[in-house]
């Protein structure tokens, strides 16, 4: 893309339109001490070979060969090579947004297939094309429950990802939506059922839980669903580790499922871009946020795909929209679709079994090394909480020297758990690496 700078006459005309005589007048509202008065420190332009050398040097600084034991919403799973090969095709890998979407039948079919696979995976009847990520998906699911029930408050379990809770708080603040929280059972690491029952009122629109939760334990979704529904509220279940559905019964007792699909072939990528999704029952379809792709036939009787029920801000008046998110994570959803297709039902199940088996081995190894594993009598998938004598951050600093990236320290969000961290084990953690991590924690 060419760079076409503005001429001085262009700048003068723009200033006149704004009622300013000079650039200084334009920036007058910004205090002088915060304004840059020198040229930007930009190096000279590079030739092509120099640019390649520059990025090779930067790439050589990457940290390779580390054993990653941190999850907490972003999981280090194997990415089949075929994914990047397929998504790099020009039909997919483009900055173009199809504002006449029916022209791009291939894109719409890919979205439709993604929705179909998500429904099969979650046991729900309808799924949207995507949300930004798991956190925005959870927030949008609560707003959806508010619209469906006409009630005006929500309850969130403290075992939900802390940063998901922060995103929801931002949404709720600007919607004037009261949010309350319920704690967890100190023995099980699961939602405190009695506290939840006492917290639900006739104004509670939604109860949000996460399973597996932030501690890695699997919640009793059926029992919580019965309790929530008896009170006339809706149950929203957040899933941050999508691979768990390869082995664990999907929480179909929920009214709405919000899920982060990063585990399905999406690179960690410094936290994004990821792909959230909302799945729900068909009777709630008109309040689901985000894009929906439907299958139909054209006037010649041929199968075709269309965007349907487009009730987002991009298409209708803002105040009537179900969501103000105008971006669809179509390319990232395609990655997840390719991943699920490559592995298939049996492959996902086998991959999930490997995660569970290696995590069970890690729990045993950590205990043998003298570490205390919390909530160990509760069912888990691929994360567990380890409590140590030394500070978790200091421990991680020591482990880094052995090329081990340790667990996620909990003290910031759960001070009552002291020197504890959530450790994650996936199919990429070899037995030798698990043993080395356990030994490092013991020392």
Swiss-Prot record:
Q: Name one Pfam family in it.
A: GDC-P
Q: Which domain of life is it from?
A: Bacteria
Q: Does the keyword Oxidoreductase apply?
A: yes
Which SUPFAM superfamilies has this protein been placed in? Answer: PLP-dependent transferases (SSF53383)
Annotated GO biological processes are: glycine decarboxylation via glycine cleavage system; nucleoside metabolic process
An MF annotation (GO) of this entry: glycine dehydrogenase (decarboxylating) activity
According to its UniProt entry, what is the function of this protein? Answer: The glycine cleavage system catalyzes the degradation of glycine. The P protein binds the alpha-amino group of glycine through its pyridoxal phosphate cofactor; CO(2) is released and the remaining methylamine moiety is then transferred to the lipoamide cofactor of the H protein.
Q: Entry's Gene3D superfamilies?
A: Aspartate Aminotransferase, domain 1, Type I PLP-dependent aspartate aminotransferase-like (Major domain)
Matching InterPro entries: GcvPA, GDC-P_N, GDC_P, PyrdxlP-dep_Trfase, PyrdxlP-dep_Trfase_major, PyrdxlP-dep_Trfase_small
Q: What is its EC number?
A: 1.4.4.2
- EC supergroup of this enzyme: oxidoreductase
- Native organism is Koribacter versatilis (strain Ellin345)
User: What reactions does this protein catalyze?
Assistant: N(6)-[(R)-lipoyl]-L-lysyl-[glycine-cleavage complex H protein] + glycine + H(+) = N(6)-[(R)-S(8)-aminomethyldihydrolipoyl]-L-lysyl-[glycine-cleavage complex H protein] + CO2
Which NCBIfam families does this one have? PRK00451.1
CDD domains from the UniProt entry: GDC-P
This protein's name:
Probable glycine dehydrogenase (decarboxylating) subunit 1
Q: Which UniProt keywords apply?
A: Oxidoreductase
Quaternary structure per UniProt?
The glycine cleavage system is composed of four proteins: P, T, L and H. In this organism, the P 'protein' is a heterodimer of two subunits.
UniProt xrefs under PANTHER family: GLYCINE CLEAVAGE SYSTEM P-PROTEIN, GLYCINE DEHYDROGENASE (DECARBOXYLATING)
